[in-house]
Amino acid sequence: MKNAIVSLLLLLMVTQYVTAQKKVIKIACIGNSITYGVGTRNPAKDSYPAVLGQMLGDGYEVRNFGVSARTMLMKGDHPYMKEERYRQALAYNPDIVTIKLGTNDTKPQNWRYKSDFKKDME
């Protein structure tokens, strides 16, 4: 009886380990034109999220949620959090998120709200 219980526990532990190992890790890359891949020949292949996905391989699913000219600042001229891509990134329910926002926040019309940057980032 003792051997059966130990065997069952061992089987459960191995099953959990194997199941955990098969889980694909989802990565959402959010950001501005740099994330989107502006300036590359083929953003679907050459943007940093695409290259990251190629480098990480099969155990990872990397999606690009970049939108050109977007800001972190909610009072900025094009706030990322008001975009459909932001809602899609949330719905994706990623395990890891990379954020590349801030470049467009330094434009004069946006930087006047710099005191809100930390609050908007939270």
Give the positions of each predicted feature:
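Bacterial Sec-dependent N-terminal signal peptides
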Residues: 1-22
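Alpha-helical cap/lid subdomain in secreted, periplasmic
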Residues: 2, 21-22, 54, 77-122
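A generic signature of intrinsically disordered, low-complexity regions enriched in glycine/proline
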Residues: 7, 36, 50, 108-109
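Residues that line or immediately flank small-molecule/substrate-binding pockets and catalytic motifs
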Residues: 8, 31, 101
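Amphipathic, positively biased hydrophobic alpha-helical segments used for protein targeting
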Residues: 9-11, 18, 42-44, 48-50, ...
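Serine-esterase "nucleophile elbow" of acetyl-processing enzymes
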Residues: 19-67, 86-91
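Acidic/histidine-rich helix-loop elements
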Residues: 37-44, 64-81, 107, 111-115
